[in-house]
């Protein structure tokens, strides 16, 4: 009997932007398939290879590695135009996309009226601003859950596509005009554009659930690439300031069609501090010069939107919560170098809520308003870590910081990232041995 291939789910342990793209890239040489399972082209992953900058929004990072296939699973919402533009950008950079990239026939499609509805809704008077990327992600998921969405398989059926667009435009145009006084969308123009796009998308489309299960059952290794972060998860995040899909490890099963028993390990990616884009609770947020300094040194601006990220200290109650929800076995700590010059590093270890110490994560967004973080101050290492390549060569105080994070969070540190390049990655021996890594992302 052939043993099943190893699998790993890589998730964001915070509010997204943790550096998952780089980590998936450096690990992907050890995997034959990398699969996206949630989100859309609102998830910006930046990867630097040989001086070239690759910004991936929808396509899995694995396609940047020769011999590694990329899969866009059924849990993703696909904007066909954005997808084709990203494919062309990769071709222009010399990436072999054709024959190495596959799109689920069951993935739902983002259409122009989804963006129109989102923009109108986000800017409506009296509406709570979520801080979306205005790319139609949420409304597409709404149509999916309302059983009125268009799937990729339907996109390829010209008769069904035309009928769907005609009916949907009648509904959406009526809604946005009545509620937001927005201009209507021309269904004929939309059909012509998307019928042409469908012809170019068609060669990538397949039943990716079959592809992934066959790969695992034949002994191939598969990595599942999460989007956003746990605290943006539709169920477990800081609702309503969340994304519209499952950003946790459980989403990998639902969003690709593989069974839960096929998941070997979960890798959680966290920055050495915290960031957040858009609105919503952020207990350890910094509103002073230190927050500005971290933003500047960490280049904390969105890969997709360019928006400045809010910054704050590492929040261990949130990290413990993320590890619990995801079953995280290994941690990847990124942006460690951003803290290199600090004399001391505060870390939130618990909260004070209504005068009482607590580690509970409030279910209500307003509950976070009552939180006062309790900090433990750790000594800084005052050493440049960007050129260190071995764990044993790290400063003693850096190791103390990492050991503290391990003890407090309940997960083991597997990788440290000290810069944007592939070779600015430090692996622990325990992680390398546990995953059987042969290539260390150079």
UniProtKB/Swiss-Prot annotation:
SUPFAM superfamilies documented for this protein: P-loop containing nucleoside triphosphate hydrolases
Enzyme superclass (EC): ligase
Pathway: Purine metabolism; AMP biosynthesis via de novo pathway; AMP from IMP: step 1/2
Chief localization: cytoplasm
Reaction catalysis annotation: IMP + L-aspartate + GTP = N(6)-(1,2-dicarboxyethyl)-AMP + GDP + phosphate + 2 H(+)
SMART domains the UniProt entry points to: Adenylsucc_synt
Single GO MF annotation: GTP binding
Binding residues for substrate: 303-309
Gene3D superfamilies linked: Adenylosuccinate Synthetase, subunit A, domain 1 (3.40.440.10), Adenylosuccinate Synthetase, subunit A, domain 2 (1.10.300.10), Adenylosuccinate Synthetase, subunit A, domain 3 (3.90.170.10)
Sequence positions that bind Mg(2+): 17, 44
Top-level taxon in the UniProt lineage: Bacteria
UniProt cross-references to Pfam families, sorted A to Z: Adenylsucc_synt
The keyword Isomerase belongs to this UniProt entry's keyword annotation: no
Entry annotation: catalytic residues: 17 (proton acceptor), 45 (proton donor)
Entry EC no(s): 6.3.4.4
The record's free-text note on cofactor binding: Binds 1 Mg(2+) ion per subunit.
Keyword field: Cytoplasm, GTP-binding, Ligase, Magnesium, Metal-binding, Nucleotide-binding, Purine biosynthesis
Residues the entry annotates as binding GTP: 16-22, 44-46, 309, 335-337, 417-419
Record-level GO cellular component terms: cytoplasm
One GO BP annotation of this record: IMP metabolic process
Localization in the cell: Cytoplasm
Subunit structure: Homodimer.
PANTHER family in alphabetical order: ADENYLOSUCCINATE SYNTHETASE
Function: Plays an important role in the de novo pathway of purine nucleotide biosynthesis. Catalyzes the first committed step in the biosynthesis of AMP from IMP.
Similarity-based family: Belongs to the adenylosuccinate synthetase family.
Protein's UniProt name: Adenylosuccinate synthetase
Gene that encodes it: purA
């Amino acid at each position: 009997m052939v043993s099943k291939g190893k699998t790993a789910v890589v998730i964001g342990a915070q509010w997204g932007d943790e550096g998952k793209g780089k980590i998936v890239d450096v690990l992907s040489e050890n995997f034959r398939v990398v699969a996206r399972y949630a989100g859309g082209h609102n998830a910006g992953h930046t990867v630097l290879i040989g001086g070239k900058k690759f910004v991936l929004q929808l396509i899995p990072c694995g396609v940047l590695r020769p011999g590694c296939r990329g899969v866009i699973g059924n849990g993703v919402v696909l904007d066909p135009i954005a997808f084709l533009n990203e494919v062309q950008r990769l071709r222009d950079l010399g990436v072999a996309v054709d024959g190495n990239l596959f799109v689920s026939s069951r993935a739902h499609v983002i259409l122009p009226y989804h963006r129109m509805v989102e923009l109108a809704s986000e800017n409506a008077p009296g509406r709570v601003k979520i801080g979306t990327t205005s790319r139609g992600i949420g409304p597409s998921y709404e149509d999916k859950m309302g059983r009125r969405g268009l799937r990729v398989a339907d996109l390829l059926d010209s008769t069904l596509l035309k009928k769907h667009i005609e009916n949907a435009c009648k509904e959406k145009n009526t809604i946005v005009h009545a509620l937001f006084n927005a201009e209507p969308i021309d269904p004929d123009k939309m059909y012509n554009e998307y019928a042409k796009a469908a012809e170019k998308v068609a060669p990538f489309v397949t039943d990716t659930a079959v592809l992934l299960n066959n790969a695992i059952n034949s002994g191939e290794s598969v990595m599942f690439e999460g989007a956003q972060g746990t605290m943006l998860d539709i169920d477990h995040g800081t609702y309503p300031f969340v994304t519209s899909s499952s950003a946790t490890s459980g989403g990998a099963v639902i969003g690709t069609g593989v069974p839960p028993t096929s998941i070997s390990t979960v890798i959680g990616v966290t920055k050495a501090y915290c960031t957040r884009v858009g609105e919503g609770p952020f207990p350890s947020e910094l509103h002073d010069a230190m927050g500005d300094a971290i933003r500047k040194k960490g280049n904390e601006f969105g890969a997709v939107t360019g928006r400045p990220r809010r910054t704050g200290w590492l929040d261990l109650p949130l990290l413990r919560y993320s590890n619990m929800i995801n079953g995280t076995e290994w941690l990847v700590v990124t942006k460690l170098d951003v803290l290199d010059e600090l004399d001391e590093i505060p870390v939130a270890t618990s909260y004070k809520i209504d005068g009482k110490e607590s580690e509970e994560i409030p279910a209500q967004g307003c509950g976070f308003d009552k939180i006062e973080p309790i900090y433990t101050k750790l000594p800084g290492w005052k050493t440049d870590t960007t050129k260190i390549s071995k764990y044993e060569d790290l400063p003693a105080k850096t190791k103390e910081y990492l050991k503290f994070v391990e003890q407090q969070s309940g997960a083991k540190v597997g990788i440290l990232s000290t810069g944007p390049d592939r070779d600015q990655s430090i692996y622990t021996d325990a992680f390398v041995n546990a995953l059987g890594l042969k290539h260390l992302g150079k």
